[in-house]
């Protein structure tokens, strides 16, 4: 009896890279694959949620984007050491397929797969390809795209798989939407894994100026940085608004399913969650994101009517208040936005990725 095939998954050390990598790992394990995660020391700290059956391989990598002059000089040597280590590991236990999810920690594994001529693919979560995925886009067999359309290098064809989401999100996929009416109104404010200061600055002020009839019915769940939480709590309290403010919500899928409106950054994982559950959104793309990729991520929601996009360059409390008021006072519009979000969802994204992995073994 032959051993189960091995898929090596290479992912960087942020939630945006790790969530879809984890979803693919879980799907492949359920289909009888062996799975190994390749990352660097930073990425290994984010791998705790991966199934215990996933083997871990920590390799040396580095980026020129951070550190001083000496650290930058050491980058080629650290990457080179990582590539050699990855080649040795792959020769000892050769993967059938190598999948990269972006981020500099994927460089050693993707380079080793290229040298050893192992079938390989990348998954790009955002609407504008990151630097590492861009470097490998012409050197892989498949390019899977989480956001559509994705800006790709000339001559490269992408396959729209969507961005895999956590099981807790899938459990609430298409949950019935309760449109805003005369009862209570739930608002969810999320800004990525560490919150977003601009949302902590703007949202409480915007809500405080809403008509009394609407403001007094609001219940807010607001994800804020730990250092901002105290002042955000005080701002809501002074406006008489019921609010739960935390640095991290471990039940975001449930709060998303319960809300009438979500105000969010436009990270790929957040947008995937919003579309799979299906909720109206006000999106505020992170202006400093590489290549302005969050604006690209938000484009499909804006064009379909599922979301309103407010660039940071024009964001103020009044514009945010206006959009909140317009959505929460119009039940028909809010319902249509929720339905439009669902049309963009790819709840089977992990399976689509797994199918591409299997395809590469034939």
Curated annotation (Swiss-Prot):
One of the Pfam families matching this protein, by short name: Glyco_tran_28_C
Biological processes per GO annotation: carbohydrate metabolic process; cell division; cell wall organization; lipid glycosylation; peptidoglycan biosynthetic process; regulation of cell shape
GO cellular component, one term: plasma membrane
EC code(s) of this entry: 2.4.1.227
Chain ranges passing through the membrane: none
Domain of life: Bacteria
Enzyme class: transferase
Keyword Cell inner membrane: yes
Reactions catalysed: di-trans,octa-cis-undecaprenyl diphospho-N-acetyl-alpha-D-muramoyl-L-alanyl-D-glutamyl-meso-2,6-diaminopimeloyl-D-alanyl-D-alanine + UDP-N-acetyl-alpha-D-glucosamine = di-trans,octa-cis-undecaprenyl diphospho-[N-acetyl-alpha-D-glucosaminyl-(1->4)]-N-acetyl-alpha-D-muramoyl-L-alanyl-D-glutamyl-meso-2,6-diaminopimeloyl-D-alanyl-D-alanine + UDP + H(+)
Annotated residues for binding of UDP-N-acetyl-alpha-D-glucosamine: 14-16, 126, 166, 193, 294
GO MF term set: UDP-N-acetyl-D-glucosamine:N-acetylmuramoyl-L-alanyl-D-glutamyl-meso-2,6-diaminopimelyl-D-alanyl-D-alanine-diphosphoundecaprenol 4-beta-N-acetylglucosaminlytransferase activity; undecaprenyldiphospho-muramoylpentapeptide beta-N-acetylglucosaminyltransferase activity
Keyword Cell inner membrane: yes
N-terminal signal peptide: none
Subcellular location: Cell inner membrane
Membrane topology label: Peripheral membrane protein
InterPro entries hit by this protein: GlcNAc_MurG (IPR006009), Glyco_trans_28_C (IPR007235), GlycoTrans_28_N (IPR004276)
Pathway the protein takes part in: Cell wall biogenesis; peptidoglycan biosynthesis
Keywords recorded for this protein, A-Z: Cell cycle, Cell division, Cell inner membrane, Cell membrane, Cell shape, Cell wall biogenesis/degradation, Glycosyltransferase, Membrane, Peptidoglycan synthesis, Transferase
Known function: Cell wall formation. Catalyzes the transfer of a GlcNAc subunit on undecaprenyl-pyrophosphoryl-MurNAc-pentapeptide (lipid intermediate I) to form undecaprenyl-pyrophosphoryl-MurNAc-(pentapeptide)GlcNAc (lipid intermediate II).
PANTHER family, per database record: GLYCOSYLTRANSFERASE (PTHR21015:SF22), UDP-N-ACETYLGLUCOSAMINE--N-ACETYLMURAMYL-(PENTAPEPTIDE) PYROPHOSPHORYL-UNDECAPRENOL N-ACETYLGLUCOSAMINE TRANSFERASE 1 (PTHR21015)
Entry similarity comment: Belongs to the glycosyltransferase 28 family. MurG subfamily.
Record's protein name: UDP-N-acetylglucosamine--N-acetylmuramyl-(pentapeptide) pyrophosphoryl-undecaprenol N-acetylglucosamine transferase
């Amino acid at each position: 009896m032959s051993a189960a095939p091995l898929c090596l998954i290479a992912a960087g050390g942020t939630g945006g890279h790790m969530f879809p990598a984890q979803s693919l790992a879980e799907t492949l394990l359920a289909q009888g694959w062996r799975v190994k995660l390749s990352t660097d020391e930073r990425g290994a700290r984010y791998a705790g949620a991966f199934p215990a059956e996933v083997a871990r391989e920590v390799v040396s990598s580095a980026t020129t984007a951070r550190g001083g002059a000496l650290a930058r000089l050491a980058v080629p040597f650290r990457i080179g050491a990582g590539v050699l280590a990855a080649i040795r590991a792959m020769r000892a236990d050769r993967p059938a397929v190598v999948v990269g999810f972006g981020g500099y920690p994927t460089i050693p594994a993707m380079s080793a797969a290229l040298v050893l001529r192992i079938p390989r693919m990348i998954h790009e979560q955002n609407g504008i390809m990151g630097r590492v995925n861009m470097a490998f886009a012409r050197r892989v067999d498949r390019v899977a795209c989480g956001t559509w359309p994705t800006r790709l290098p000339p001559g490269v064809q992408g396959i729209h798989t969507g961005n895999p989401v956590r099981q807790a999100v899938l459990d609430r996929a298409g949950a019935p939407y309760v449109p805003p009416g005369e009862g209570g109104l739930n608002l969810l404010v999320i800004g990525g894994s560490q919150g977003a200061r601009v949302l902590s600055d703007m949202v409480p002020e915007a809500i405080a100026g809403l008509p009394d009839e609407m403001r007094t019915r609001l219940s807010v769940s607001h994800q804020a940085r730990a250092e901002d939480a105290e002042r955000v709590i005080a701002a809501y309290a002074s406006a008489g608004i019921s609010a739960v403010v935390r640095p991290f919500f471990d039940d975001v899928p449930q709060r998303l399913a319960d809300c009438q409106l979500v105000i969010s950054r436009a990270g790929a994982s957040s947008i995937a969650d919003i579309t799979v559950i299906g909720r109206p959104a006000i999106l505020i793309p992170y202006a400093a994101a590489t290549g302005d990729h969050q604006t690209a991520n938000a484009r499909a929601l804006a064009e379909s009517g599922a979301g309103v996009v407010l660039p940071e360059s024009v964001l103020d409390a009044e514009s945010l208040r206006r959009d909140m008021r317009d959505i929460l006072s119009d039940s028909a519009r809010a319902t249509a936005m929720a339905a439009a979000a669902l049309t963009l969802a790819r709840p089977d994204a992990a399976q689509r990725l797994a199918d591409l992995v299997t395809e590469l073994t034939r």
